[in-house]
Amino acid sequence: MTIIIDGKKIANDLCERLSQKIDILKREYNIFPCLKVILVGSNPASQVYVRNKQKKAESIGISSETIVLPDNISEDELIEKINELNEDPSVHGILVQLPLPNHISASRVINTVSVEKDVDGFHDENVGKLVKGEKNCLIPCTPKGSLHLIKSIEENLSGKNAVVIGRSNIVGKPMFYLLLQENCTVTILHSQSKDLAEYCSKADIVVAAVGKPNFVQADWIKKGAIVIDVGINSVNVGKLVGDVDFEGIKGKAKAMTPVPGGVGPMTIAFLMMNTVIAACLQKGVDASNFIS
C-alpha cells in the first residue's frame, strides 16, 4: 500500500512549531521577522502565490508586505526599490516573485537582493554555498521542502539511488546537491535525456520537476520507491496534475506526493523558515535553535 504524503499537514505542523520559535525570538531576542514580497505586474497565478505566502506569514507571526509594481517599471527602478529594502534593517527577507516581464533581467534582479535577505536562495553566492555544502546559507524552498518530505518516510538516505528529473536552477539542480549531501548516488535527468525509464527503474527516490503533465510513467518506477512530484500543470479546464502518473504509480511506490497538497505547501513553509533563518543571520543569532 502506497503512503500518500500529506504535504499540507506536514507543512502546517512545521509552521505551528515555527510560530512558537518566532514568539521566543520576539520575546527574548527582540527580533521581529519581516518579509517583503515584490510583485511586478498583475499575473493572476503570481497574485495567488503571493497572497498565500503573505497569509501564511501573518498567521505565524512574521510581518509581511507585498509591494506591487507596474509591469512597465524599468529594470533600474526595480533595482532601486530592492536596494532600499536591502538597506532597511527592519526587513529580513526579500522575495521577488517570478516570472518577471521580459524587459527585466531576472538574473540581475536576483543578484541585487542581499545574500542574507535572499529567502528564495537564488543568489549566486547562496547557490555557491549550497554546492560547497556550507550550512550557513539560504537554500531554495521547493527542494528543501521536498527533501523534508522524503525524510518523513525514510530518515537515513545514505547509499540510496536517487533520480532528479529536471535541471532548473529553482528545483532540479539544488535538489541534486541536497540529495548528494545526504550521501545518495544521484542522477539528474531532463526532458531530453535518453533511457529515462532505465534510470528511474533503478531509483529508490524519484523527484520529478520537469513541468510536463503525467510525464513519469508507472512502468518506470521501481516497486517500493519514494516519488516526489514537484510538477503542477493545468489540464482540462483548470484541473491540476503533476509530472507523474499518480494513479498508475499509486500501489507500486512506497510513498508519493499528491498534486495539489504535496510539495506546494512545503515550499511556503520553508519560505517562512528561510525568513527566520535570514533574521537570525542578520542579528548574529544561531538559527539552528529556531528551525529544528
Swiss-Prot record:
| E.C. number | 1.5.1.5, 3.5.4.9
Q: Which HAMAP family match?
A: THF_DHG_CYH
UniProt KW Oxidoreductase keyword: yes
Q: What does this chain do?
A: Catalyzes the oxidation of 5,10-methylenetetrahydrofolate to 5,10-methenyltetrahydrofolate and then the hydrolysis of 5,10-methenyltetrahydrofolate to 10-formyltetrahydrofolate.
Which superkingdom? Bacteria
What InterPro entries does the record point to?
Answer: Aminoacid_DH-like_N_sf, NAD(P)-bd_dom_sf, THF_DH/CycHdrlase, THF_DH/CycHdrlase_cat_dom, THF_DH/CycHdrlase_CS, THF_DH/CycHdrlase_NAD-bd_dom
Q: What is this protein called?
A: Bifunctional protein FolD
- Family of the protein in this entry: Belongs to the tetrahydrofolate dehydrogenase/cyclohydrolase family.
The entry's NADP(+)-binding residues are: G166, R167, S168, S191, I232
UniProt lists the gene as folD
Q: Which reaction does it catalyse?
A: (6R)-5,10-methylene-5,6,7,8-tetrahydrofolate + NADP(+) = (6R)-5,10-methenyltetrahydrofolate + NADPH; (6R)-5,10-methenyltetrahydrofolate + H2O = (6R)-10-formyltetrahydrofolate + H(+)
Pathway the protein contributes to: One-carbon metabolism; tetrahydrofolate interconversion
Q: Does the keyword Oxidoreductase apply?
A: yes
- Cellular component aspect of the GO annotation: cytosol
Q: For this UniProt record, give its keywords in alphabetical order, as a comma-separated list.
A: Amino-acid biosynthesis, Histidine biosynthesis, Hydrolase, Methionine biosynthesis, Multifunctional enzyme, NADP, One-carbon metabolism, Oxidoreductase, Purine biosynthesis
The molecular function terms in GO held by this entry are: methenyltetrahydrofolate cyclohydrolase activity; methylenetetrahydrofolate dehydrogenase (NADP+) activity
